A protein has these predicted regions:
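N-terminal helix-turn-helix DNA-binding core of bacterial DNA-binding proteins
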Residues: 16-53
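Basic, amphipathic "hinge/linker" alpha-helix immediately C-terminal to the N-terminal HTH DNA-binding motif
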Residues: 77-95
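Arg/Lys-rich, alpha-helical DNA-contact motif
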Residues: 93-126
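N-terminal positioning helix adjacent to the helix-turn-helix/winged-helix DNA-binding module
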Residues: 24-27, 43, 84, 95, ...
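Residue-level recognition of specific faces of alpha-helices
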Residues: 31, 61-64, 70, 84, ...
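C-terminal regulatory/oligomerization modules of transcriptional regulators
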Residues: 2-13, 115-139
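Canonical helix-turn-helix DNA-binding module
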Residues: 44-75, 79
Length: 139
């Protein structure tokens, strides 16, 4: 079985929900969360600028995530995270911040630390992440 499939299965189990996202979907949810904290209200164009992707890509992702129950859009086309979407976004963002902070603390260039954190945040299992977090806290 491929590693990424195992990670996704663990993620599903962790959320106690049959719905799951892809790495790209998690990136979109994380971006919406970050932008909501920064701007309050989020539009597709904001997500496109933040992620440096095309507006059609955002529209496709928003549609897919809406169908999955991760977000909604209102009559003014603002994007809102559902409880499920917020849960996923917050978990991914927490991991991102954790890895970025610790990579920088060991001397990794901030840009490289951000890029590496963005990759690792999706693939690490919940169990491994929690054990790593515990071990760092104990030190």
């Amino acid at each position: 079985m491929r590693f990424s499939l195992l990670v996704r299965m663990a993620w599903e189990k962790e959320m106690n929900n049959k719905q799951h996202t892809t790495t790209a979907g998690e990136d979109y949810l994380e971006s919406v969360l970050i932008l909501q904290k920064k701007l309050g209200m989020v539009r597709s164009v904001d997500v496109a600028r933040h992620m440096e992707v095309s507006k059609p890509s955002v529209c496709y992702a928003v549609g897919t995530l809406r169908e999955g129950g991760f977000l909604t859009t209102d009559e003014n086309h603002y994007i809102h995270l559902t409880d499920l979407g917020r849960d996923v976004a917050e978990k991914i963002y927490e991991r991102h911040c954790f890895f970025t902070k610790h990579f920088i603390s060991i001397g990794v260039d901030p840009e490289t630390a951000e890029a590496d954190a963005c990759r690792i945040e999706h693939d690490i299992s919940a169990e491994t992440y929690e054990r790593l977090k515990e071990s760092v806290t104990k030190e």
